[in-house]
Regions:
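Enzymes that bind and transform nitrogen-containing heteroaromatic metabolites
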Residues: 1-216
């Protein structure tokens, strides 16, 4: 049965997954990009963007598997953008250029209606204004039997967690204290009764945690 999954989602030691102050120069907020240094170091990331080099090993293996059996994605409007300092917000088509790295349908949660559009490489963006369950239903239909990836950001992951709709999370704990920002595990009382950590895999840079919905 297809699942809703979170994969390679970075979280700091004090629980933050995004920093305040998002802008064109700082998509993850001020100093938030430090959460992603482990990704930038992998061979998988460098190969994806046509660059040589990158390290192999545990982190690279997790990144290489992060798109396995994914047929569609869901993200929040803050992850899609635009940031507050974008000049032409109506023309905004995401952070990723003309050929985004998704290569499948992406459903963006939004409070404002916006026409769907297609990008190079098979990525399409559809904007959903009637809630998280509607987005999930549309994403599962588009995925055609494959899993749906919940890409982020933190507020969106938190909404789906509170609703108990996520089947599996792969969180990456980065040895970094941020002090402020946005957490996924905030105001999610009762989540401990729904989920459990079943796998802990440390690398030299980060720790990988697999959290699944408890069997009933």
């Amino acid at each position: 049965m297809p699942k809703l999954v979170v994969r390679s989602f970075a979280i700091s030691l004090d629980g933050f997954s995004a920093a305040p102050g998002q802008s064109l120069e700082a998509p993850f907020g001020k100093d938030g990009l430090k959460l992603m240094n482990w990704v930038f170091a992998t061979r998988f990331f460098n190969t994806m963007f046509g660059k040589p080099g990158g390290v192999e090993g545990i982190d690279n293996d997790f990144m290489a598997r992060s798109d396995d059996n994914i047929g569609a994605s869901i993200m929040g409007r803050h992850m899609f953008g635009p940031p507050p300092d974008a000049k032409d917000k109506e023309a905004w088509k995401g952070w990723w250029g003309e050929n985004p790295p998704y290569h499948h349908p992406v459903f963006v949660l939004s409070h404002q209606k916006k026409a769907s559009f297609d990008m190079e490489g098979g990525t399409s963006f559809t904007f959903v204004t009637d809630g998280i369950e509607s987005a999930l239903k549309q994403a599962f239909a588009a995925a055609k039997g494959k899993d749906v990836r919940l890409a982020g950001g933190p507020a969106t992951v938190r909404q789906y967690l509170k609703a108990g709709l996520i089947d599996e999370l792969h969180l990456v704990q980065v040895p970094l204290l941020m002090g402020q920002g946005e957490r996924i595990f905030e105001d999610v009382g009762g989540v401990e009764s729904l989920y459990e950590c079943v796998e802990f895999t440390p690398s030299k840079a980060v720790s990988h945690l697999r959290i699944v919905k408890k069997a009933r």
